[in-house]
């Protein structure tokens, strides 16, 4: 199990302190499983590297500043989690009403935007994708704004966030501030910590299965996903994510849980 960050963050006053603490974690933070034996593991440090690079991309390529609007149309994917955290890092407002920046995985998700964002970030699902490998032409047919290839652009961004952290009163959702989000993250971390999540054998679990079955289809869902992820990470657990497009059955998920020493906390009543 990774270090429990609650003692360090119990009096935190900003999300920036959470991000800074996670950047020092070298144990697994995100573990992603999909079909064909695909497994991606990101330490806290690597996750925050993705977050910082993604936040810089939002600043440099999408003209994002504090209060700019962003919306993600996607099923749960580890890259989308990193990008949603980057939006918080940059002070963006999660909003699906005429967002300045849209995020999609393909033409089908791009078509869900009722009004074209100024910038559309295309994310590839491939584990080692260096660029978008899907049908770009199909995306052009449903979207008439500027299309940016996330995988091709993000790697060239600086490893450290180059912007200013948002003020605690900056809104993440309408009526929900950064300070509110921090309070929710710490609340969830304390819940994980108080339950002392354990395997059926009684041994401490190393990871918890992401419970949020939402897509990123609404701003509220997006925020619920990242709050659950950050709450678990602050409490010292890695977050196991199974690809929602893979259609894993409970019988298929069971050996994944066992191999990662992970727990589905819904079964334990968290």
Feature locations, PLM:
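Conserved AMP-binding/adenylate-forming core of the ANL superfamily
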Residues: 30-64, 162-219, 250-253
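Long terminal accessory regions outside catalytic cores
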Residues: 1-13, 33-40, 46, 55, ...
């Amino acid at each position: 199990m990774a270090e429990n960050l609650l003692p360090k963050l119990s009096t935190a006053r900003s999300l920036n302190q959470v991000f800074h603490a996670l950047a020092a974690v070298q144990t697994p933070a995100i573990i992603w499983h999909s079909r064909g034996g695909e497994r991606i593991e990101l330490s806290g440090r690597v996750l925050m590297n993705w977050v910082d690079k993604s936040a810089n991309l939002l600043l440099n390529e999408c003209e994002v500043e504090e209060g700019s609007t962003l919306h993600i149309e996607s099923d749960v994917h580890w890259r989308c989690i990193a990008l949603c955290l980057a939006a918080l890092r940059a002070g963006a407002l999660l909003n699906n009403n005429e967002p300045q920046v849209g995020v999609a995985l393909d033409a089908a998700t791009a078509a869900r935007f009722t009004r074209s964002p100024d910038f559309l970030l295309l994310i590839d699902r491939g584990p080692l994708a260096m660029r978008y490998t899907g049908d770009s032409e199909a995306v052009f047919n449903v979207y008439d704004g500027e299309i940016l290839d996330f995988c091709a652009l993000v790697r060239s961004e600086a490893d450290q966030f180059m912007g200013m952290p948002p003020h605690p009163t900056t809104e993440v959702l309408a009526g929900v501030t950064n300070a509110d989000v921090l309070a929710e993250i710490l609340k969830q971390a304390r819940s994980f910590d108080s339950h002392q999540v354990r395997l059926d054998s009684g041994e401490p679990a190393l990871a918890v299965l992401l419970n949020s079955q939402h897509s990123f289809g609404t701003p509220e869902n997006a925020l619920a996903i990242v709050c659950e992820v950050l709450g678990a990470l602050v409490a010292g657990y890695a977050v196991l994510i199974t690809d929602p497009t893979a259609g894993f059955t409970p019988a298929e998920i069971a050996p994944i849980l066992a191999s990662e020493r992970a727990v589905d906390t819904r079964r334990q009543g968290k």
